[in-house]
Amino acid sequence: MAKQPTALIILDGFANRESEHGNAVKQAHKPNFDRYYSKYPTTQIEASGLDVGLPEGQMGNSEVGHMNIGAGRIVYQSLTRINKSIADGDFFENDVLNNAVQHVNEHDSALHVFGLLSDGGVHSHYQHLFALLELAKQKGLDKVYVHAFLDGRDVDQKSALKYIEETEAKFKSLGVGEFASISGRYYAMDRDKRWDREQKAYNAIRNFEGPAYASAKEGVEANYANDLTDEFVEPFIVEGQNNGINDGDAVIFFNFRPDRAAQLSEVFTNKAFDGFKVEQVKDLFYATFTKYNDNVDTEVVFEKVDLTNTIGEVAQNNNLKQLRIAETEKYPHVTYFMSGGRNEEFEGERRRLIDSPKVATYDLKPEMSAYEVKDALLEELDKGDLDLIILNFANPDMVGHSGMLEPTIKAIEAVDECLGEVVDKILDMNGYAIITADHGNSDQVLTDDDQPMTTHTTNPVPVIVTKEGVTLRETGRLGDLAPTLLDLLNVGQPSDMTGESLIKH
């Protein structure tokens, strides 16, 4: 006899917003979604900011969203986790940071601090540099040299002087720290093995070689005069007490996002490095805020938090058969991120990957591979052995990123057609579906003055639970979806899954 499946259907980038202007969700003809919405219990939940472990007011995204959904709790992202540790004071007790200080004291050497100097919050945050300066002050260090990388991508193209001035004011108020070198991120944060770029940054940092200026401000202004924006500022050195990185020194790299910090760290820490000629620093203590990759041998300030008892693991522990299904664009989200950063399948889990169409941009094919995803799912349902299904329709998000209203409306209409077939089939099997989203996007693809808006939104996302006779809580967050699934599956919720079922009892 066929099982009664419970499905989580994620309409990626589909949120609630009152205004119809630029709102593809409101303007699309979606009879199936509307039918379920009027027939079954509904609510809306938060998918951004503190509710998903991001700083207040920060829009959610698919990685963060799926991680919170799968974990069934708030998953604190690196930026928030570090901010919290600074606010709590734990930062100043951190073993790795204090080992760096001890190393400097034992060797009567210098502390060098690397990182992206901005408040973009994508790779780093300059307030974390300020916390490191506070730590150096508390511990009585006097030789602290900052090697700043300029942003101009996640913040305004020419905003570096603001951050430089604030940092210099911090040096002055604490009586510790000075700029040693400055590089545009184009050089210091390359990730494609363009060693000619990285070498210029390395020479300024390690060997104290390059154009020299009396101050960071003077060097940046000289680059501006050559029509270079922050990202492309050529590595230069700032005249002062620093003379490069020497034997026995310590480095702390405060970028928390690994991809653009790994390469430079590899130059310093990988003895087999051969991208260009380097002279290894002897007895160098090298710490990074997070683990960058396996080629980078460093002390790690904030170790990765392993997420246990995610929805997939709980399903496995209860001998449930589960399916993860999406097209290429969102396949990592329903697998790796939904499983808390785990690539391997759980026991009883199978996966279906449907290729996304090969087009330059998805506004050219708004239906993407939704119909193929739907067909594959119907095929899987026919096997009759599934307990849990996690499905993602990518269209509202991927087409929404075009900032084009008509294609985004078409994308939602295609998804609605597929939704109808999938949900009706699940209902025919006496199963249940939760229809929801991971963050907003297609709910606003135009600004108030009709310019394309390509970013996500912070609007709440809808939840429909296709079970008559139950009442849903009025509010919640993405971390409440896994507990709701377990509730529908009649499976106990583990204690580390701290979200709450949206179904009132």
Curated annotation (Swiss-Prot):
Q: Which residues form the active site?
A: 62 (phosphoserine intermediate)
From the UniProt record, give the pathway where this protein acts: Carbohydrate degradation; glycolysis; pyruvate from D-glyceraldehyde 3-phosphate: step 3/5
Q: Which GO terms describe its cellular component?
A: cytosol
Q: Which UniProt keywords apply?
A: Glycolysis, Isomerase, Manganese, Metal-binding
Which metal ions or organic cofactors does this protein require, according to UniProt? Mn(2+)
The GO annotation for biological process reads: glucose catabolic process; glycolytic process
Q: Catalytic activity annotated for this protein?
A: (2R)-2-phosphoglycerate = (2R)-3-phosphoglycerate
Record-listed Mn(2+) 2 binding positions: 12, 62, 438-439
Q: How is the cofactor bound?
A: Binds 2 manganese ions per subunit.
Summarize where substrate binds, as residue positions.
123, 153-154, 185, 191, 257-260, 330
Q: Which InterPro entries match?
A: Alkaline_phosphatase_core_sf, BPG-indep_PGM_N, Metalloenzyme, PGAM_B_sf, Pgm_bpd_ind
Q: Per the UniProt record, which EC number(s) apply here?
A: 5.4.2.12
Its family remark reads: Belongs to the BPG-independent phosphoglycerate mutase family.
Spell out the protein name for this chain. 2,3-bisphosphoglycerate-independent phosphoglycerate mutase
